[in-house]
Amino acid sequence: MDWFHCNQCFRKDGAHFFVTSCGHIFCKKCVTLEKCAVCGTACKHLALSDNLKPQEKMFFKSPVETALQYFSHISQVWSFQKKQTDLLIAFYKHRITKLETAMQETQQALVSQDKELSVLRKENGELKKFLAILKESPSRYQGSRSITPRPVAITSPSQSVTPRPSFQHSSQVVSRSSSVESVPYREAGFGSLGQGGRGLQGRRTPRDSYNETPSPASTHSLSYRPSSASSGQGIFSFRPSPNGHSGHTRVLTPNNLAQRESRTTLESLPSFQLPVLQTPYQQQRQMGLPSGREAWTTSR
């Protein structure tokens, strides 16, 4: 220590030196007990020896040695703190990795839910539109479900009706009617039968306004007879010929026409053709019979 000397006489050699509380060094000759000889302040004195305390010895050591000692301590402190910091960083890195994985899964689920939500919104909009249409016109959809197509009987126009030669009248030809509504079955009286026949000839639909040629090969017959002179009602009787397969007779009167019309139509019968209506006077002239009410039959 080349810096060590007495602050009063500046000597370096000697065995006994003292240091004051005010920071001055004195040799044994220059030291004063009352006050410091350099600054004149009251102070305490401490004799320098090898038995000094560590906090007192540190002032007489080399700064490099003190620095190395402190650097070693600082390095230990820094290593300890760095180790703790590394552990904390590793924990945060692991946690960040887990959070990133969870975030990716959440994003995928969110995309899937967005697609499903868009589909549900589209379906909901369509259902709302359909519900609005149903609220506006509910009877139209209910009516369309309740209406079912009904079969329509169609008679081939190639089939024809042939009256008997003795009863055929060239001036009266009755066209086939397409439905039961176009045939007037009500007669005002037996005397107006000719007028009713002309009315049947006049009421024709455009599709059925053609004449048919009678055929002698017909197997069915149609007859008309008045029920009584006073009632003024006619009876149409459909009966097959002796060569036919059916053995029953169908009778249509103006009274039960409405009931028959609800169950079947005349066109549903096989090859139905309207008869040639004649007055009793014309029948008597053709047959050469005396006056009287007799049934007339038209072969089909």
Swiss-Prot record:
Its EC number is 2.3.2.27. GO terms for cellular component: synaptonemal complex. Residues 191-200 have a biased composition (Gly residues). Pathway: Protein modification; protein ubiquitination. Its main location: nucleus. Residues 155-169, 211-234 have a biased composition (Polar residues). Autoubiquitinated. InterPro entries: Zip3/RNF212-like, Znf_RING_CS. Residues 170-183 have a biased composition (Low complexity). It comes from the Eukaryota. It is an enzyme of class 2 (transferase). A zinc finger (RING-type) spans 6-40. Residues 88-124 form a coiled coil. One of its GO terms (biological process) is homologous chromosome pairing at meiosis. It catalyses: S-ubiquitinyl-[E2 ubiquitin-conjugating enzyme]-L-cysteine + [acceptor protein]-L-lysine = [E2 ubiquitin-conjugating enzyme]-L-cysteine + N(6)-ubiquitinyl-[acceptor protein]-L-lysine. It is found in: Chromosome. Homodimer. This is E3 ubiquitin-protein ligase RNF212B. The gene is RNF212B.
